[in-house]
Amino acid sequence: MSTTAMWLLLAVVVIVIVFASVLYKRTFTVHELALTGVMAALSLVAYLFFRVPFYGGSSFHLGNTFTALTALLLDGVSGGLAGAIGLALADILAGDPGYAVTTFILKFIIGITCGAVAHKVFKLRELDKHTPGYLAKVIVAAASGLLLNVFTDPFLGYFRNVYIFGQEYTIAKALTKITGGVTFVNSVASTV
């Protein structure tokens, strides 16, 4: 797939997510936009400057930490957008534009999941921070999206490698196993 087609695909994904936000009548305050932008920048910096590249296109990094943190502080959509924008741009700037589309989708899923568990299931905004179990609920909310990524990242990565990059099935399957392990370590490190 050409670079132009990848940019087009990324643009379509962004437009679909923005359109979905409009359908759900989601509006952002200036504070939310500013914090989302700062967290997107922090996730980009955490990926570009503090990562350990690993075989198969994956790497150890703490960029997902800011996705989960934004989802906990604001909401799932803001967290998803912070991680999606920051880490998709990081992929492009790191010279891996082919990964940007799946990164955008995966990080948005992390943010939505963390935010839904934090604010819809546990209702963290309504709880007193000093109540017993508050910290455990925060950790579970953060871990929910990050651990979901352990399954979705290798799954989407397999299809990206086979159908976009044109890899053989056996190679893509082997890389999926490696990616799953690296993603698990990233998830645990980002949760802690």
Labelled PLM ranges:
Residues 1-192:
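Loop-helix junctions at membrane interfaces
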